Each structure stands twice: as C-alpha cells, then as structure tokens.
A protein has these predicted regions:
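Glycine-rich phosphate/pyrophosphate-binding loops
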Residues: 93-96, 140-158
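Short, active-site-adjacent cap segments at secondary-structure transitions
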Residues: 38-40, 69-73, 101, 121, ...
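N-terminal glycine-/serine-/threonine-rich phosphate-binding loop
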Residues: 1-63
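Ligand-binding beta-strand-loop-alpha-helix segment within the catalytic cores
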Residues: 71-119
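Catalytic-site beta-strand/loop segments enriched in glycine and acidic/polar residues
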Residues: 29-33, 106-131
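Alpha-helix C-terminal capping segments
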Residues: 54-58, 87, 135-143
C-alpha cells in the first residue's frame, strides 16, 4: 500500500512540475521527426505514440514526420504509424510530402498529420525526413522541432 501511495504522489509531483510547460505549449505546433522503429522496439514505439497522443490531449498540436526503413513501402509505413496513433486514442492522417494547406486542414479537423517525405516521382529519390521536418516547421511556424534519434546530441557524418 505504501508503494502505491508513493507512486501516486510521484505522479502528482511530476504533473505539478509539468503544468507551467503545459500552459506554455497549449495551441502551439510541435514537429516531431523520428526513424520509424528502426532503433525503437515495438513497445518503445507504442510509448512514443502514447506520448504524442498525450501532447495532443493537453492542447499541443503535434505533427509527426517519419523515415521509412529501407525495403519497406513508405505509404504502408505511413498508414501503420497513423493507425498506431489511432489505437492510442486520437485521429491521425497519413500525408505524403509538404503541403501547408493540407496540414492546416488536417489540424483544424483535429487529426495528427503523419508525414512521409515524398519525392516527385514517388519512387527513386531519397529525401531526408529531417529536411522535411525542418521545412514543415518553418512553413507552419512551429514553436518546436524535435528530432528523435538513436545518436546522442547532433550527429554528423564525418566520412
């Protein structure tokens, strides 16, 4: 019983500490870019989706940009991530590429946009999702841009 009360007290303390930040980010756009499950286990990826849904439920406007692992159909991966968000309790819509009007419409209809970078031909050219996330953050005047990576700090290819 003591452990149960300690757990509740801990959760209450965390929530109290978070309240000022929650207020600061209500109705603010946050773009989150991550490498789809390539370095996250299924359990960790589901926790990430729950965290994104939590952000939305407290009034933050998340936009998700993802990378598709090699050999995986990018449209199928996009649908998978949108479905994961829906299973966590929110509406999500898979979108290809960057179109500000579509993003605004998606957000205004209470959906989380889930974006896969898309080349013009839909096939050949690799587009870095970090570049797409940055482009979206700028065009949507996002308040935060978050890159989730397996690398600590900022990774640069020194080769």
């Amino acid at each position: 019983m003591d452990r149960y009360l300690e757990n509740i007290e801990h959760k209450a303390a965390v929530l109290c500490d978070a309240l000022p930040y929650i207020r600061d980010f209500v109705n603010k756009i946050i773009v989150v870019e991550y490498d789809c499950g390539e370095w996250l286990s299924g359990v960790e990826e589901k926790k990430l989706m729950k965290d994104i849904v939590l952000l939305k439920s407290i009034g933050v406007i998340p936009i998700v940009v993802h990378r598709t692992p090699m050999g995986v159909d990018k449209f199928r991966e996009n649908k998978r991530i949108a479905k994961m968000l829906e299973l966590c309790g929110t509406k999500a819509l898979g979108i290809c590429g960057v179109d500000v009007e579509t993003l605004h419409m998606t957000i205004s209809n209470d959906y989380i946009p889930v974006i896969v970078p898309n080349d013009i031909d839909n096939e050949m050219e690799y587009i870095d999702p970090k570049d797409t996330a940055l482009e979206i953050a700028v065009k949507m005047q996002a308040d935060k841009l978050i890159y989730l990576s397996r690398y600590p700090g900022i990774y640069t290819d020194e080769t």
